[in-house]
């Protein structure tokens, strides 16, 4: 696959080509992006534009709550907090820290609709 000049668009292309979730690869019910270590937006691969604000707000809320001191390579921060995202529980945000040597330099993030997140009772 040829790379574009926009890393956000490359992330979008890779997700749609590899997703098992039909909502992601057919309806494009997601957004991906790159953020600084402080949570500022660097690049967005447009999927569903309504997620842009929610994804940035969610990353900043995670950083405020947990801090960055304990984040290590291989960690993934996951949340579906509907209050922060301004959405609903099926919208999951994944934030993967990016390191250069030992320094946290940013995050790769994805906010997407998951068809099934489980519940106390079937069908609810």
Regions found by a protein language model. Give the residues of each.
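Acidic-enriched, low-complexity/disordered segments with a strong bias for Aspartate over Glutamate
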Residues: 6, 10, 29, 75, ...
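Short alpha-helix boundary/capping segments
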Residues: 47-50, 90, 123-124
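Conserved mixed alpha/beta core segments that line enzyme active sites in large multi-domain catalysts
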Residues: 13-14, 18-21, 40-42, 56-97
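FAD-binding core of FAD-dependent oxidoreductases
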Residues: 50-53, 93, 109
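Long, charge-dense accessory insertions within large macromolecular proteins
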Residues: 1-56
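Acidic, glycine-rich active-site loops and adjacent beta-strand->loop/helix elements
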Residues: 48, 81-85, 111-116
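Mobile "lid/hinge" segments at catalytic clefts and subdomain interfaces of large enzymes
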Residues: 101-124
């Amino acid at each position: 696959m040829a790379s574009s000049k926009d890393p956000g668009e490359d992330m979008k292309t890779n997700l749609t080509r590899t997703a098992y979730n039909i909502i992601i690869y057919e309806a494009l019910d997601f957004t991906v992006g790159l953020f600084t270590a402080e949570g500022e937006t660097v690049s967005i691969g447009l999927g569903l534009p309504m997620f842009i604000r929610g994804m940035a707000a969610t990353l900043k809320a995670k950083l405020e709550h947990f801090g960055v001191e304990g984040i290590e390579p291989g960690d993934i921060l996951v949340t579906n907090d509907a209050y922060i995202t301004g959405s609903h529980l099926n919208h999951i945000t994944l934030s993967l820290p990016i390191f250069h040597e030992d320094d946290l330099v940013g995050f790769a993030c994805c906010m997407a609709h998951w068809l099934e997140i489980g519940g106390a009772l079937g069908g609810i």
